[in-house]
């Protein structure tokens, strides 16, 4: 009996995350080759896994538009003609040491979004127990995608990886007299506002129980 039969929603490494992710990338490749809009969004601390690099390069060559937020190491070089010209890699290193991993495939209402504990590294995908799970709620899925828009709008800390391995500081392109937009500061302010609104309305948050045994929290 396969390991996947034990799970309804979870994708669990080392057996499931990489194959399922490659399947999702293949789905976007099929769309691109058919002349349909195809997109991949990824947020990871690093990308060093050869299989993922080769698969994303294949997707780029097929015409899939790929945008990646990679805070640290990237062994994938974007903007190489004929190979990775459809890949954009940016990095935001600011006040918050972010560790969230997001993997999204598709365009518009057909976008599928996964959150994960796994970076795009061989040690995470092939040698550790890691998990990935889909964001099925439409409102939450939209919120995650809006997060990407916010981060990519950063003009204070965003740096873009070039094909020669250097980074371009986008803050240098902010018009004189205009304050740079700091995405992390913006998200912090949003969190404070949401917390104040929750307190004012008496909103309570759900508590979790062990589904296997039931009971009360």
Language model features: what each stretch is:
Residues 2-7, 14-217:
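PLD/PLD-like phosphodiesterase catalytic module centered on the HKD motif
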